[in-house]
């Protein structure tokens, strides 16, 4: 069935930019900047739906489930970007948050013709992951009508997985297909139909909230410190030390000693210092409290 794209908000013309090709560079950028300021407010309007999705993802993680993003083009790339940042930031397994893009890995750098129109591909990509009812699938598409994503959402619902959609058009097909509809309506783009702009920015803000919120709820943040960060490069090794110092008030030397005694596991080092435990005692207490530092400190 053909869709009249001109009826979509994301495909409509923006009256603020109809003469943008006649403006000076600074005037052009002012128009873009003014339009961008609308994005955060659009996201604010859908915080309840984002919160509901965060809670669903947190519950999935607690039950051994995964978060799977699905999208085509820019939307798919944003999902992959968000997923790829979770292991170094929060020490998660690469399979805990997964990003799928229509057309596969080659589509990350180069568009794959007709991939987004393939309903079956969306279903097959999820089947290849051995999706279960414990997983959460989040479909991403500015238009809210991408067949690849709709196919995935349909399959996910059929096996009992929780589904959510992120789109920038009201009353779209994806909103109806998902258990939770996140619809930040950002309005027409500065360049008509260029949904990598405001719509893409809104999607990125929502994705930031989904994984950050779920990781906080899963005990991977103490205060506002990323206490499960892994030491995969020199910058992150130094960040680990700084995190332990900030969390405990210890000196850098004390922080380094604790980290070196526990294979540079931030949570363990923090608990060692704050609760005056050795590495094995701290690891054991953390495990007993599912990795939550505050609970381990209270030890109730």
Swiss-Prot record:
EC annotation from Swiss-Prot or TrEMBL: 4.2.1.126
HAMAP family: MurQ
Keyword terms of this UniProt record: Carbohydrate metabolism, Lyase
Regions annotated as coiled coil: none
Keyword Lyase carried by entry: yes
Protein name according to UniProt: N-acetylmuramic acid 6-phosphate etherase 2
Pathway entry: Amino-sugar metabolism; 1,6-anhydro-N-acetylmuramate degradation; Amino-sugar metabolism; N-acetylmuramate degradation; Cell wall biogenesis; peptidoglycan recycling
Pfam families assigned: GKRP_SIS_N
Catalytic residue positions: 85 (proton donor), 116
Domain SIS, residue spans: 57-220
BP terms from Gene Ontology: 1,6-anhydro-N-acetyl-beta-muramic acid catabolic process; amino sugar catabolic process; N-acetylmuramic acid catabolic process; peptidoglycan turnover
Lineage: Bacteria, Pseudomonadati, Pseudomonadota, Gammaproteobacteria, Vibrionales
The protein's role, per its UniProt record: Specifically catalyzes the cleavage of the D-lactyl ether substituent of MurNAc 6-phosphate, producing GlcNAc 6-phosphate and D-lactate. Together with AnmK, is also required for the utilization of anhydro-N-acetylmuramic acid (anhMurNAc) either imported from the medium or derived from its own cell wall murein, and thus plays a role in cell wall recycling.
Protein family membership: Belongs to the GCKR-like family. MurNAc-6-P etherase subfamily.
Reactions this protein catalyses: N-acetyl-D-muramate 6-phosphate + H2O = N-acetyl-D-glucosamine 6-phosphate + (R)-lactate
Single GO molecular function: carbohydrate derivative binding
Oligomer and partners: Homodimer.
Other remarks in the entry: A lyase-type mechanism (elimination/hydration) is suggested for the cleavage of the lactyl ether bond of MurNAc 6-phosphate, with the formation of an alpha,beta-unsaturated aldehyde intermediate with (E)-stereochemistry, followed by the syn addition of water to give product.
């Amino acid at each position: 069935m053909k869709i009249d794209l001109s009826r979509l908000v994301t495909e409509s013309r923006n009256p603020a930019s109809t003469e943008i090709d006649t403006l000076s560079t600074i005037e052009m950028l002012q128009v873009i900047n003014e339009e961008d300021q609308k994005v955060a407010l659009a996201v604010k309007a859908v915080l309840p739906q984002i919160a509901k999705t965060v809670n669903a993802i947190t519950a999935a993680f607690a039950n051994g489930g995964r978060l799977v993003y699905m999208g085509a083009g820019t939307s798919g790339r944003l999902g992959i970007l968000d997923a790829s940042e979770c292991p170094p930031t929060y020490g998660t397994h690469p399979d805990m948050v997964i990003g799928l893009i229509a057309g596969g890995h080659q589509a990350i750098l180069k568009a794959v013709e007709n991939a987004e129109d393939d309903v079956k591909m969306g279903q097959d990509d999820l089947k290849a992951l051995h999706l279960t009812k414990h997983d959460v699938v989040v479909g991403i598409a500015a238009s809210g009508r991408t067949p690849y994503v709709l196919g995935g959402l349909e399959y996910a619902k059929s096996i009992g997985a929780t589904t959510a959609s992120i789109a920038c058009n009201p009353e779209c097909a994806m909103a109806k297909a998902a258990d939770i509809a996140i619809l930040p309506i950002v309005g027409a783009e500065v360049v008509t139909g260029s949904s990598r702009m405001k719509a893409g920015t809104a999607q990125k803000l929502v994705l930031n909230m989904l994984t950050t919120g779920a990781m906080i709820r899963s005990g991977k943040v103490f205060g506002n410190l990323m206490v499960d960060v892994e030491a995969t490069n020199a910058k992150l090794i130094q960040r680990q030390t700084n995190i332990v110092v900030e969390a405990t008030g210890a000196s850098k030397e004390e922080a380094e000693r604790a980290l070196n005694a526990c294979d540079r596991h931030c949570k363990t080092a923090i608990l060692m210092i704050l609760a005056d435990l050795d590495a094995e005692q701290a690891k054991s207490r953390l495990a007993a409290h599912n990795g939550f530092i505050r609970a381990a400190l209270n030890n109730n």
